[in-house]
Amino acid sequence: MLKFIRGKGQQPTAERQRLQKDLFAYRKTAQHGFPHKPSALAYDPVAKLMAIGTQTGAIKVFGQPGVELYAQHTLVNNSAAELNVQLLEWVYGTGRILSLTAANQLILWEPVGTTLVPIKTLPFDGKLKKVSSLCCSLNKDLLWIGTEGGNIYQLDLKSFTIREPVIYHDVVLEQVPPTYKLNPGAIESIRQLPNSLNKLLIAYNRGLCVLWDMQTSAVERAYIAPGHGQSVGLSVNSTGTEFSWYHADGSYATWSIDNGEPPQNVNYVPYGPDPCKSINRLYKGQRGTNDVIVFSGGMPRSAYGDHNCVSVHVSDGHKVCLDFTSKVIDFFVTYKEGSDDVEVLIVLLEEELCAYDLTDPSILSIKAPYLHSVHASAVTCNYLASQVTQGVYERILRAGDEQDIDYSSIDWPITGGVLTDDSVESDEDEVVKDYEILLTGHEDGSVKFWDCTGVLLKPIYNFKTASIFGNEHEYREDGAADISAEQLDEGEPPFRKAGLFDPYSDDPRLAVKKIAFCPKTGQLVVGGTAGQIVIADFDTAAEDQSSLKYNSMNLVSDRDGFVWKGHDQLNVRANLLEDNAVPLTENGVNITGVLQVLPPASITCMALEANWGLVSGGTAHGLVLFDFKNFVPVFHRCTLNPNDLTGAGEQLSRRKSFKKSLRESFRKLRKGRSTRNNPTNQVPTTLEARPVERQIEARCTDDGLGSMVRCLLFAKTYVTNVNITSPTLWSATNASTVSVFLLHLPPAQTAATTVPPASGNVPPQASRRISAQLAKEIQLKHRAPVVGISIFDQTGSPVDQFNAGENGSPPHRLLIASEEQFKVFSLPQLKPINKYKLTANEGARIRRIHFGSFSCRISPELLQSLHSGSPTKSVRSHGEGDGAGNVSATSAAGRGDLYHEMALICLTNMGDIMVLSVPELKRQLNAAAVRREDINGISSLCFTNDGEALYMMSSSELQRIALSTSKVVQPTGIVEVEPLESEDNETASLVNDGNESDKDGEANKELANTASDTQPPVATLRAKPLELNADRSSLHLTNGISNSNSPNRANETITSSIGDITVDSVRDHLNTTTTTLCSTTTEETVGRLSVLSTQTNQATTTVNMKDIPDINIPNLMDLASKSNTTETSTSSVVIKSVITSISHEKTNGESENVTTKTTAHEESQF
């Protein structure tokens, strides 16, 4: 039975474990894109902040570009529907925000770092107390809560309790004119007059509005709008002299606050006289001398009731109805300071965020700096281009600027928050740098370029392929239809198409399946669903530009009996292929040509080598190799077997036949007898025992085609002999067949490997064509689909990531990653070196692989111990590149040497990300990154060269994660919090509770003085662990206090450490204080701690959690907040596990070294 015991193998050394912690760390950093299922919107005109709530309980706060804060509600009754954020209300100018959930729970949030922390919670019970509206006082001390029962409660924001008086609806009814005899219904809107803060405008559901005087607790004036059905809301002007009242029948009117009589246009319906839908939100302002009314809804119910519109009506007669393709959630209008002059309209839709310039009569669109809709058309593939050169990046920007000429140049109005000095300095220092560009392929045939180098995901270019295909007549008709649809008849609502979200695609064959992009030359290749490969580049200044070229390659033309039963190929427009046609250069991109692969099956993989002018594409039927410089085919190979061609045979099966299974059973019986009879065959020892492996189930016959090409790779490596590198193309299929093709390049392409071409379309000087031949073929025995191939050099760097002319340091090694295992081979012998069976050991399957670069600063002592390590590790300074013999000991400003290491990153079908060393394939990190149920997130994940990853956490959002400690991109902006007045008392109580257990008078005075001087908010005190520096080293205390103040002159060092801090432990210890035991020359083992602080030598030491190192700060964002922890005014201690090591060195001339470990457990309540 010992052979079934897993062998532990060789364990990493202590130095290696230290280095692993310095190199690898998993954390979720930033979120890009548009929030999934938004449900609420709020704007703070004082702090210039915007907040969005979602149906999943998320809250996102945005200020100036770079300021982003995230929060997440927690389950109350284990019902996800209760997480829906229904209302958001800012406490103006303080940075705090209130949220109301579907569970009728009111929560006060406060920004701490880059997160929002819930500090107060108030639940409401009963149907009559169902909250319908919120209004925060301009004095920042009260919140008025309107309910569906018609009552208004006052919430004291300092104590977060309901206080008197309550404005009951029956009290209000007693003071309104007797002509109003209805039950007023729910509170629809509450507004405080800006010129008279003791007066409230209250709008009830059934056509009643009152002006309430809070000093006298009486109705000062009543406004009755009969005949309009339900009221919806109010909008008060900046001077507090008039208000706009809008209703559910599509009407609105402007009332004077000093006059209760209805205005003359009280029956005005903008889109009447037909019955109209409700106006959901309305703002009124001015543009010069003209009044501007902005409202959502109000469409004629029968004709245009299904339109999602926001209308802008100006008193000079100009009207625009912005017609969106998704539901309008909410919107707001920004004004100039202290006036009613409108500036910007910001509309939150179900699928996107749109902004418009209201100062311009043409109401131009504004390009927002964030919250872009990644899924304007459904995303079909992702490609992440790392280390894009600045020259290529600038060319993409110039092309994108040509597309942005129709946008307004007005400044973005949301400018709240403060950017830290680090983020500002880094932007100024890095003048020349590499960029990270995310390319998303879409269902409509477009490819969008996103700059994801920093926290902001900025759209920089949109490449469209749909205009190439189709006939000319259809294309012209579509263009005419788009122009005519801009405006309808004058008698109808003046519709204008608005927004970018377009979920519909004219032709599913246009969908982009694979993308290849060269970060050094800017060459772009796009593969589609119908076997089309579009070749383009960003060099529009080339002199030899010609008309669009077209070519096709048939994979099964020489095979008899094959019948393609799928969709037809796309037709290139005939006018583009004429000899006198102008070059297809649009918006800064030159489209060179189109390659059509036949049969027109979907492109399953692509590889691009711009220096050689080659592109290779794979389908379910085989692969093609194409020379796009000369635009001629080079090579094609069909991977189908005869059974697949005729359809008579089944797909490749991994099930054993009955004859083979019976034969193996008899062999096992014979082998078992011989083993029992042979005493020399002993059971291996524990160290030699093989690990227990899961049985790999045979794949069923309905698996994917074994002929499908899964991955392609261009590499210049050692194939024929050990001394000379040769250009090669590697391919792999679903049936574990790896083929190596030797490429014969003419002199021009060979020279291009040493000198990069100036553009992607420079034709070769020689007339000799490129040729390819099959050199080697590898058949893996387990026959699992191959998901990735990579060739790396001695330092572990992939050779395909090198610049032109660099081959890497020999020897080269080949990594083949199938769904079940990794295998490393030597080159050119192709001898197995190492392997890692993931499915057998872990039960997971490999989905994606990538090589990443990891680096950190290390001490010279650690450097010496690493000199004898793996050859794939190196130590280098800032100015050195990747290569062999690149080991140096250059120290930068005394911070240590820059240690560099290449590693293999792997994503599994369980959503886990593993980091493995190469070529040893030893696991360095394993993190659960994506939920295993999130199939879309797992399939969309892509890695960068610096150990980062992006995946789609929803159909519209991207989550960024970091695996390296040296490259972490996360929001650095903060929101300054204005302290509440009542926090002085709470802070004093915190200090007093600490003084009760402290007998050192001087220390007490220092604590009290510090607290009284700073007066920090309670939430800031409670969340101080969030302000940790993840790179801080361990803190060493001498006798628990500083060296200079130590009363004990003996040379004793006490180091206190706490075990692994997890999210669960920190959740229970948000306000934990750890107490260190102080000792002199006598020690004893302490079984438990019965007091909150221990005194020795008349000195008590308290260490806050900020002194505890190695806390993963971004993981604290996922903490489930406890409402009861925010209600207490004392600081309690909870110690789970404290390990105290006391080390005695030479004392009083005696040489002695004694170590005592004390483990203490204590539990207390908050």
From Swiss-Prot:
Alphabetized GO MF terms: GTPase activator activity; myosin II binding; syntaxin binding
Tissue specificity as recorded in UniProt: Expressed in the epithelial cells of the digestive tract and in gonads, in the ovary's nurse and oocyte's follicle cells.
PTM text: Phosphorylated by aPKC which restricts l(2)gl activity to the oocyte posterior and is required for oocyte polarity formation.
Residue stretches of each WD repeat: 39-72, 82-128, 131-167, 189-223, 231-263, 278-320, 328-358, 380-464, 513-595, 604-665, 709-779, 788-833, 838-928, 942-965
GO biological process terms, semicolon-separated: cortical actin cytoskeleton organization; establishment of spindle orientation; exocytosis; Golgi to plasma membrane transport; regulation of establishment or maintenance of cell polarity; regulation of Notch signaling pathway
Location of region: Disordered: 867-888, 975-1002, 1144-1166
Pfam family, one: LLGL
Subcellular location: Cell membrane; Secreted, Extracellular space, Extracellular matrix
Keywords: Cell cycle, Cell membrane, Exocytosis, Extracellular matrix, Membrane, Repeat, Secreted, Tumor suppressor, WD repeat
Disruption phenotype: Malignant transformation of the optic centers of the larval brain and the imaginal disks.
GO cellular component: cortical actin cytoskeleton; extracellular region; plasma membrane
InterPro entries cross-referenced by the UniProt entry: Lethal2_giant (IPR000664), LLGL2 (IPR013577), WD40/YVTN_repeat-like_dom_sf (IPR015943), WD40_repeat_dom_sf (IPR036322), WD40_rpt (IPR001680)
The keyword Zinc appears for this protein: no
Entry-linked PANTHER family: LETHAL 2 GIANT LARVAE PROTEIN, LETHAL(2) GIANT LARVAE PROTEIN
Family as reported in the entry's similarity comment: Belongs to the WD repeat L(2)GL family.
Functional note: Essential for the development of polarized epithelia, for cell polarity associated with asymmetric cell division of neuroblasts during development, and for oocyte polarity formation. Promotes the formation of actin-rich projections at the oocyte cortex and the posterior enrichment of par-1 which is required for oocyte polarization. Regulates the localization of axis-specifying morphogens such as stau and grk. Could act as a tumor suppressor.
Subunit-level organization: May form multimeric complexes. Interacts with mahj. Interacts with aPKC; the interaction results in phosphorylation of l(2)gl. Interacts with ball.
Protein name: Lethal(2) giant larvae protein
Organism: Drosophila pseudoobscura pseudoobscura
Gene name of this polypeptide: l(2)gl
